[in-house]
Amino acid sequence: MIYTLDSYNPEKEGRLPVFIWAYPREYTSKKVASQVRNSPYRFTRINYGSPIFWALRGYAVMASTEMPIVGFDGDQPNDSFRDQLVMNAKSAIDKIVDMGVGDRDRVGVGGHSYGAFMTANLLAHSDLF
């Protein structure tokens, strides 16, 4: 889900800084990882720690961004955690930039619990942020 202000107009305002909020999930197969788990008909829940707050500050917020970590050929998903994580983050950034919404040079990332572990790994092992 991507959140921006209702008044945001890409033609007038240009590209926005981006905040990616994610939580990686581990899967043992590509088939299971590809299942749809979200719906555009869900209610948006905002609480004191919600990343959606940043949309009110002019960011494009990618909330609940999918970061699947898949085990291949009997390997455990975490055997290739970093590589898949960086690939997922790059894909998310490429998508929002291709949509004309996000600015590739102003991207931040965050998450809670395992999402914080993901954040630390992305900051340490990529040059995306």
Model-derived regions: residue spans:
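Serine-hydrolase catalytic core recognition
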Residues: M1-F129
